């Protein structure tokens, strides 16, 4: 028997009610279809009660379909599986034994069964009967606590699904469940993970990169943005806004006292990002700040730079350590790019970790109204990496 379906599970969507649940399930199906198509998998996506079923046209696509499905927000876990029809519990157990028989030969195993919409037998009945058949076919014994192999059976009506792996997905909510947001994105560890975490909560995240005139930093940021979009942004078309901030940095360095320069630049970026978000219809800003990680990210300084903003500033990394952030970057596939990013702050002196509010306001007023050129905008799904870099003057 070859895998002919992929079972897709979700958790948080299941606790929603009525219209909200139905809407989120539709968003999940749309994102799954897009991810599968991008992976070159031909399949039909079908909604079941509490599950999504990916019905494969080619059994050879099972592994690719499972990988693609596990990259969709809202998915708790996925399992390549064999779908069969059965006439009764004996027929079900025989077909399951045909699938699992060689897999458990000589191995200590257990059976885990679930059923829905079935009368006439229980999950325990399935486990006992299948376990008996597998022992007769050469299994090495049963251990319910620490088996070498677990045979999973899920019964739904007159169909059953056999599988032996449960691969985790990202969880969260499908993209589109929440309103769109704009992430201040540098291409480093923090901002990439922050954007991913808000995408995971259902917000279509777009990215704004503030360019201080360092080509290496811009190139890494574009590559990271393309990777984030290409691996995780299913169900929408994320945009990258490249903002020329070189002039702003020069003015700040020339007019603002050294100990306030980083904070003033950060507030300028937040105010500009807020205006950009308002024009584009985004309803929140996202930053990668972690409380106390650097001097500009103390509680006092975070209050100073974001005071009075109309849009909420989402800081999903606020309580995370740097090691946790780096590890999450590795998990989501951004580590190898983010580790190449160069440190660019735009100013030549770190801030006071306990800056004076009065002093900060006084220094910020010196540059409040400086001109910032309109951003260059790129479709991260529709434009190639080479095309974007060429437009930015980073490729011939």
Curated annotation (Swiss-Prot):
Keywords: ATP-binding, Cytoplasm, Nucleotide-binding, RNA-binding, Thiamine biosynthesis, Transferase, tRNA-binding. Pathway: Cofactor biosynthesis; thiamine diphosphate biosynthesis. One of its GO terms (cellular component) is cytosol. Its EC number is 2.8.1.4. The keyword Cytoplasm applies. One of its GO terms (biological process) is thiamine biosynthetic process. Gene3D superfamilies: 3.30.2130.30, HUPs. Residues 63-166 form the THUMP domain. It holds the Pfam family ThiI_fer. It catalyses: [ThiI sulfur-carrier protein]-S-sulfanyl-L-cysteine + a uridine in tRNA + 2 reduced [2Fe-2S]-[ferredoxin] + ATP + H(+) = [ThiI sulfur-carrier protein]-L-cysteine + a 4-thiouridine in tRNA + 2 oxidized [2Fe-2S]-[ferredoxin] + AMP + diphosphate; [ThiS sulfur-carrier protein]-C-terminal Gly-Gly-AMP + S-sulfanyl-L-cysteinyl-[cysteine desulfurase] + AH2 = [ThiS sulfur-carrier protein]-C-terminal-Gly-aminoethanethioate + L-cysteinyl-[cysteine desulfurase] + A + AMP + 2 H(+). ATP binds at residues 184-185, 266, 288, 297. GO terms for molecular function: ATP binding; CCA tRNA nucleotidyltransferase activity; tRNA binding; tRNA-uracil-4 sulfurtransferase activity. Coiled coil: none annotated. It is found in: Cytoplasm. Catalyzes the ATP-dependent transfer of a sulfur to tRNA to produce 4-thiouridine in position 8 of tRNAs, which functions as a near-UV photosensor. Also catalyzes the transfer of sulfur to the sulfur carrier protein ThiS, forming ThiS-thiocarboxylate. This is a step in the synthesis of thiazole, in the thiamine biosynthesis pathway. The sulfur is donated as persulfide by IscS. HAMAP family: ThiI (MF_00021). Belongs to the ThiI family. This is Probable tRNA sulfurtransferase. The gene is thiI.
